[in-house]
């Protein structure tokens, strides 16, 4: 039926391509005209386009000319000219869609077209890749095009930011790779101010979070999120969609409970009855716990709970789930997952220095620096017996889903997106357009071979590799885990077949190994998508063979002359071209998949390594009924029974029915994972709206020069709240006393002489006005004491500090809410509706807590800075006294005498000599005359606080030092204001019970 409708109505993708064809023809028509322009005339097109945009034309109006300009500039600078299909890809990207372009079709070159066009608006455009190397190489390779046309190009990495400058030579870069040598270091802000910025998804996201933790406007690096092209868009927006970016800080130290629970769960026995049988057939588990492999969840049986209660020595009559023991369930759950679900060399690896490093499920790459949250990483560390690192508290977090949806226009490109088009449309509002290849695809995708056991499958893989290796065809073997890649490597070694292994443990030479995987007789074992972004050239890459040819001549990259390098490169090129032709005659690259992935597009990515740009090639998947996908989602038992009865273990099945079964299993998993991600984004959207409100408030505080009135308004609201709380109709003296006690928590300068008696006889309105007048007077005095300029900074710092402190607590509370809210489903309530209701209530509390945090800390914060000012002024007063005190010796001559200090030099953080037990800065700093009396010594000068009031010179010094403090704050040398010795923690609005 669907095929009939497609024939009747036409394929929507073909319609879209036909619609774009006239634009391509217009660009081609402009080709000769632009080819006739001089370099200067072609370069001047950029200014012309900018002016036309300023005059009211749109990007669509100038698209044909802009694309023709880039095409000609690319031809003149890097010797590449965009094909028509690449022009189509560029138009699709400009329109904010996803362009599916097969491996080797030149996505890096395609991106130059929409990047140039959209950069003309002057708002900054981003090219997002999956790793630093691809970002730097891509920007450096295309850099000459942008530079020729007068655009600036920036690059950001984890520990580097730079601008493309052809006149700059990086002494530390490989001089043979021109893509890497012309990067001039710059600040991160400068890299973002470039017309075009290349970087990774992680760095763009983390910079956004860091910007929203900044305390000064000068610390911001990103501009408004305008336009981005996401390379490998399926990897970033789908595979990584549920992975949140988290900036964290240290929390409490890790508990010994992790090690204790790791030992306890080893004594538990897994049930042979599966989760599916428990749910669908009502069977009872025959062990202490059972595993739902589909959701990667673990459930304790009644027997298991009783066993744990015995092992934990919980007293009779009490339960593991009682409040006093409930905390342990969190550790038990993580210990069970670490022991029975997360496998070493599949989900993580342990480095030689004892660090647990996560392995990316989709790429097989190690991800150093990333940690599982919520205690899972600590549980795995306890399982492996390595050092357990402290838990962290989340300071800021965002998912890729929410970060990339903030761009005004978003586009993406990848080799495999069509199977996920529904998800791209529903979550990101992105349409997928399949771009035709420049040359016809002639790769042969052979039928799957399915074996009963894993052992039979791997034996068949070995036989196929031997056959291909004997005739000289290069082979790429794709695996789903480090463990599998090492198992195959061991088999190849025993068979005497030379090969390269590329997995999380051997990633250093990733690009080099993949680039040479197309040489004659090469055998490469790689985990999923390793080397993605690097083309496999049949015959090999001459750049990678350069060192080998130089070594034969007794030379190295460093010692060879340019002429020797050029000669060696020509030899390498000739060899790779000849070898490439031979490999093509043999049939090209043969790709072997050792297991089907949950997502069909991951399988397609592996197949896509062969047959690039019209080259010959082939692919085949070898499967077994013991593979995880079939075990979890396929009707294994029925098929296995048939195979055991009718087929020898070494004979594969190639039935079309099984192919449909496998594809059906993959479709079900894709649907399930889509639902999970959709469910995740529905919950995240609630948090995202709240994040946007908080971050917008932070930005307003950074942008606003004077927050005085806002702070006073917050204080007035808090006083009103205190009066409403304490002074109910017919209030008594005790109520007035409680009110004054509450007010002094905001403003401790209220004289002790002000008592309930002072306020007796006044109305509520008169009392409120009395306190407001006193508060405003105090505020004005504090402002004079620290100078108005510094007061503005104190206001900003206290407000930002309050937002950040309360936001961190809120993130923790929301995380707990999200974990527990799913229990609402058991009460026949929609968890999402309940989550929204509860989170809105908590968000109102958050706003109240932020306001009260500001109110209770603003005045104490001024004393913190004034104490610092007093210390500086005191030192200046003493220096003045030492230099200028004079006396007569009786002969009329003036004798200069040094002014002696009658009290010893005391550091601010030393204990005060008065014996109070407090630090000097919290006790007698500024009241040295009192301290001198206590120590039976007369002070040599009036106290610094008096000198500040009486001496114009020291008042000037205070203003100068205030300016210095302001400068230090702006440069990040002084920390944000937190609570102070005189300050008190603001009372929080109760959030309800925590788990």
Curated annotation (Swiss-Prot):
Membrane topology: Peripheral membrane protein
Top-level EC class as recorded in UniProt: translocase
GO cellular component: cell envelope Sec protein transport complex; cytoplasm; plasma membrane
Listed cofactors: Zn(2+)
Domain of life: Bacteria
Region ranges (Disordered): 883-911, 939-995
Matches recorded under Pfam families: P-loop_SecA (PF21090), SEC-C (PF02810), SecA_DEAD (PF07517), SecA_PP_bind (PF01043), SecA_SW (PF07516)
Organism: Chloroflexus aurantiacus (strain ATCC 29366 / DSM 635 / J-10-fl)
One BP term from GO: protein targeting
UniProt-listed PANTHER family: CHLOROPLAST PROTEIN-TRANSPORTING ATPASE (PTHR30612:SF0), SECA INNER MEMBRANE COMPONENT OF SEC PROTEIN SECRETION SYSTEM (PTHR30612)
CDD domains: DEXDc_SecA, SF2_C_secA
Name the record gives this protein: Protein translocase subunit SecA
Family note: Belongs to the SecA family.
E.C. code: 7.4.2.8
Alphabetical list of InterPro entries matching this protein: Helicase_ATP-bd, Helicase_C-like, P-loop_NTPase, SEC_C_motif, SecA, SecA_CS, SecA_DEAD, SecA_motor_DEAD
Compositionally biased intervals (Low complexity): 957-969
Entry keyword Manganese: no
Localization of this protein: Cell membrane; Cytoplasm
Role played: Part of the Sec protein translocase complex. Interacts with the SecYEG preprotein conducting channel. Has a central role in coupling the hydrolysis of ATP to the transfer of proteins into and across the cell membrane, serving as an ATP-driven molecular motor driving the stepwise translocation of polypeptide chains across the membrane.
């Amino acid at each position: 039926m669907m095929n009939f409708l497609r024939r009747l109505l036409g394929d929507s993708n073909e319609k879209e391509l036909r619609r774009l064809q006239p634009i391509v023809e217009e660009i081609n028509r402009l080709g000769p005209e632009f080819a006739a322009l001089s370099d200067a005339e072609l370069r001047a097109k950029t200014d012309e386009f900018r002016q036309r945009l300023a005059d009211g034309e749109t990007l669509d109006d100038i698209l044909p000319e802009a694309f023709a300009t880039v095409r000609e500039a690319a031809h003149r600078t890097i010797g590449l000219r965009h094909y028509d299909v690449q022009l189509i890809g560029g138009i699709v990207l400009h329109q904010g869609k996803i362009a599916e372009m097969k491996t080797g079709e030149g996505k890096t070159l395609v991106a130059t077209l929409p990047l140039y066009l959209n950069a003309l608006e002057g708002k900054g455009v981003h090219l997002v890749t999956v790793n630093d190397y691809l970002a730097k190489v891509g920007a450096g390779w295309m850099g000459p095009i942008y530079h020729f046309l007068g655009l600036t190009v920036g690059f950001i990495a984890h520990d580097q930011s730079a601008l493309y400058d052809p006149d700059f030579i990086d002494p530390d870069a490989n001089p043979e790779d021109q893509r890497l040598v012309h990067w001039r270091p710059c600040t991160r802000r400068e890299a973002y101010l470039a017309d075009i910025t290349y970087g990774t998804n992680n760095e763009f996201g983390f910079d956004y979070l860091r910007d929203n933790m900044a305390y000064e406007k000068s610390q911001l690096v990103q501009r408004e999120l305008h336009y981005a092209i996401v390379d490998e868009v399926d990897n970033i927006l789908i595979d990584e969609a549920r992975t949140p970016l988290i900036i964290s800080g240290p929390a409490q130290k890790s508990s010994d409970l992790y090690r204790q629970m790791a030992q306890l769960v080893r004594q538990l026995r897994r049930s042979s009855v599966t989760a599916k049988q428990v749910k669908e057939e009502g069977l009872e588990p025959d062990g202490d716990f059972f595993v739902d492999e589909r959701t990667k969840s673990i459930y304790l049986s009644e027997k298991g709970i009783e066993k744990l209660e015995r092992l934990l020595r919980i007293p009779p009559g009490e339960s593991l789930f009682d409040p006093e023991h409930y905390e342990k369930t969190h550790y038990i759950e993580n210990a069970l997952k670490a022991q029975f679900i997360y496998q070493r060399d599949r989900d993580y690896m342990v480095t030689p220095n004892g660090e647990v490093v996560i392995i990316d499920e989709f790429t097989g790459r190690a991800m150093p620096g990333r940690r599982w949250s919520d205690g899972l990483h600590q549980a795995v560390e306890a399982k492996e017996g390595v050092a357990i690192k402290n838990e962290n508290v989340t300071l800021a977090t965002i998912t890729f889903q929410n970060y990339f949806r903030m761009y005004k226009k978003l586009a993406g490109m990848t080799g495999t997106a069509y199977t996920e088009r529904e998800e791209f449309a529903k979550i990101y509002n992105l349409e997928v357009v399949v771009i035709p290849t420049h040359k016809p695809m002639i790769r042969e995708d052979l039928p799957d071979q399915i074996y009963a056991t894993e052992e039979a499958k791997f034996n068949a893989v070995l036989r196929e590799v031997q056959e291909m290796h004997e005739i000289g065809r290069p082979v790429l073997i794709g695996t789903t885990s480090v463990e599998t890649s090492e198992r195959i490597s061991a088999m190849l070694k025993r068979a005497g077949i030379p090969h390269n292994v590329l997995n999380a443990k051997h990633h250093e030479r990733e690009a080099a190994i993949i680039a040479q995987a197309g040489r004659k007789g090469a055998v490469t074992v790689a985990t999923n998508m390793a080397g993605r972004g690097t083309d496999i050239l049949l015959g090999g890459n001459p750049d990678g063979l350069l060192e080998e040819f130089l070594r034969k001549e007794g030379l190295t990259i460093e010692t060879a002359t340019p002429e020797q390098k050029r000669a060696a490169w020509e030899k390498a090129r000739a060899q790779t071209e000849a070898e490439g032709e031979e490999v093509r005659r043999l049939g090209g690259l043969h790709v072997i998949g050792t297991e089907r992935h949950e997502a069909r597009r991951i399988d397609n990515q592996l197949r896509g390594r062969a047959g690039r740009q019209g080259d010959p090639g082939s692919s085949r998947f070898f499967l077994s009924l013991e593979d995880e996908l079939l075990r979890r989602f396929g009707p294994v038992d029925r098929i296995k029974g048939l195979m055991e009865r009718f087929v020898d273990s070494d004979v594969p099945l190639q039935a079309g029915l099984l192919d449909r079964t496998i594809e059906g299993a993959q479709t079900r998993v894709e649907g399930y994972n889509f639902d999970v991600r959709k469910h995740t984004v529905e919950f995240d959207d609630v948090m995202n709206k709240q994040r946007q409100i908080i971050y917008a408030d932070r930005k307003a505080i950074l942008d606003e020069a004077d927050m005085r009135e806002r702070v006073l308004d917050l204080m007035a609201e808090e006083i009103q709240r205190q009066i409403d709380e304490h002074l109910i109709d017919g209030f008594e003296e005790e109520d007035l006393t409680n009110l004054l006690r509450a007010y002094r928590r905001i403003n401790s300068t209220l004289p002790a002489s002000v008592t309930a008696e002072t306020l007796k006889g006044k109305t509520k309105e008169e009392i409120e006005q009395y306190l407001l007048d006193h508060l405003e007077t105090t505020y004005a005095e504090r402002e004079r004491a620290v100078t108005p300029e510094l007061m503005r900074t104190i206001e900003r710092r206290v407000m930002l500090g309050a937002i950040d402190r309360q936001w961190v607590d809120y993130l923790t509370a929301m995380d707990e809410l999200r974990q527990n809210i799913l229990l609402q489903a058991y009460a026949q309530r929609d968890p999402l509706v309940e989550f929204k209701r509860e989170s809105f209530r908590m968000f109102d509390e958050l706003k109240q807590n932020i306001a009260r945090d500001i109110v209770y800390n603003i005045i104490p914060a001024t004393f913190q800075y004034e104490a610092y000012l007093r210390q500086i002024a005191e030192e200046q007063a003493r220096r003045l006294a030492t230099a200028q005190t004079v006396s007569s010796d009786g002969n009329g001559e003036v004798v200069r005498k040094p002014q002696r200090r009658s009290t010893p030099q005391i550091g601010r953080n030393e204990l005060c000599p008065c014996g109070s037990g407090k630090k000097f800065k919290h006790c007698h700093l500024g009241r040295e005359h009192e301290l001198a009396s206590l120590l039976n010594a007369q002070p040599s000068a009036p106290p610094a606080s008096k000198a500040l009031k009486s001496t114009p010179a020291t008042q000037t010094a205070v203003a100068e030092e205030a300016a210095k403090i302001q400068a230090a704050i702006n440069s990040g040398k002084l920390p944000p204001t937190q609570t102070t010795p005189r300050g008190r923690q603001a009372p929080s609005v109760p959030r309800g019970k925590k788990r």
